[in-house]
């Protein structure tokens, strides 16, 4: 299962808690076509409706992610001005 962000991690945990690890692993093998094994695709295979609470990222996690992105952008801006 591919988990790229906090929402994916919450969704994966909920799927495993709700359906069990074996059912989730089996559903991963039934993903059709070229779709990747993201938790949302596995949920579709299981016919699961995800709770609204899983869809929202908590403010603290969102702020932390934004701060990391700002640091990354600031680092690139410094490199670019040094290259001139």
UniProtKB/Swiss-Prot annotation:
It comes from the Bacteria. Keywords: Plasmid. Plasmid pJD1 is the smallest of the gonococcal plasmids. Its function is unknown. This is Cryptic plasmid protein A. It comes from Neisseria gonorrhoeae.
């Amino acid at each position: 299962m591919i988990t790229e962000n906090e929402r994916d991690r919450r969704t994966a945990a909920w799927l495993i808690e709700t359906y069990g690890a074996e059912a989730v692993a089996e559903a991963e093998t039934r993903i059709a076509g070229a779709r990747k094994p993201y938790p949302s695709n596995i949920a579709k295979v299981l016919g699961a409706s995800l709770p609204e609470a899983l869809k929202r990222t908590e403010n603290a996690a969102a702020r932390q992610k934004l701060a990391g992105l700002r640091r990354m952008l600031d680092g690139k801006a410094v490199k670019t001005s040094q290259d001139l």
